Structure formats: C-alpha cells, structure tokens
Amino acid sequence: MARIAGVDLPRDKRIEAALPYIYGIGWSLSREILKKTGIDPDTRVRDLTEEQVAKLREVIDHEYKVEGDLQREVQMNIKRLIEIGCYRGLRHRRGLPVRGQRTKTNARTRKGPRRTVAGKKKAK
C-alpha cells in the first residue's frame, strides 16, 4: 500500500483516482502530478514501483501544500479574518454563510439544525 503525505492510498484504484484521497489534491491536480512524474494515469496503485512512489512523494511534498499544512493555512486565514473584524470574519464568527447567500430560508448547513421559536398565543 502506497503511503503519500500521511495517507494510505487504496490499492485497487487507478493512481489517477487514488491521489484525490489526499486533502488538497483533486482530479485535475492529480493528472498534472502524474504528467510531471511521467506515470501512466491508468496504473493501479498496487502496480507502482518503489521508485515511482518515491517520485510521487517527492513532487507532492516539495511542490504542493497538502493535508495538515493546507488545513492549517486555511484555518489561519479564517482566524485572521475574524481578528481583523471584517465582514467575512463576522460571518465566520456567527456561523453564517460567508459568500452572500440568502439566510431567510435555507443556509441550514452553516446554521445547523433549526431552533424552534415559540409561536404567538391565539386571541379569543
């Protein structure tokens, strides 16, 4: 089993489909990395040689921010927005959508489950 950037890649998948298991690498970046290393995208992970795995590991570690480093950078960016008190920082702090989406309805992913508010009493 190939272990790259602290992630065990699934043995039975093609290397092109296995690389996106690493946080920060999607399909297009996966193809770009394989082109740089000269590895055929249709190769299965189990069929990679140690030399190919080492080449992949070197390219990913030296040229791209992935996994923990990338997650840390994203968190630091959010923390900076909150500290400077900008609008985006306030939205992050309040747990609301940051990019201008509506909040009268929807936005449940950001806001979490509904909190029921007591209704008005019916007048007699």
From Swiss-Prot:
GO terms for cellular component: cytosol; small ribosomal subunit. Belongs to the universal ribosomal protein uS13 family. Located at the top of the head of the 30S subunit, it contacts several helices of the 16S rRNA. In the 70S ribosome it contacts the 23S rRNA (bridge B1a) and protein L5 of the 50S subunit (bridge B1b), connecting the 2 subunits; these bridges are implicated in subunit movement. Contacts the tRNAs in the A and P-sites. SUPFAM superfamilies: S13-like H2TH domain. Part of the 30S ribosomal subunit. Forms a loose heterodimer with protein S19. Forms two bridges to the 50S subunit in the 70S ribosome. One of its GO terms (biological process) is translation. This is Small ribosomal subunit protein uS13. PANTHER family: 30S RIBOSOMAL PROTEIN S13/40S RIBOSOMAL PROTEIN S18, SMALL RIBOSOMAL SUBUNIT PROTEIN US13M. One of its GO terms (molecular function) is structural constituent of ribosome. InterPro entries: Rbsml_uS13_C (IPR027437), Ribosomal_uS13 (IPR001892), Ribosomal_uS13-like_H2TH (IPR010979), Ribosomal_uS13_bac-type (IPR019980), Ribosomal_uS13_CS (IPR018269). PROSITE patterns: RIBOSOMAL_S13_1, RIBOSOMAL_S13_2. It comes from the Bacteria. It comes from Symbiobacterium thermophilum (strain DSM 24528 / JCM 14929 / IAM 14863 / T). HAMAP family: Ribosomal_uS13. Residues 96-124 are annotated as: Disordered. Keywords: Ribonucleoprotein, Ribosomal protein, RNA-binding, rRNA-binding, tRNA-binding.
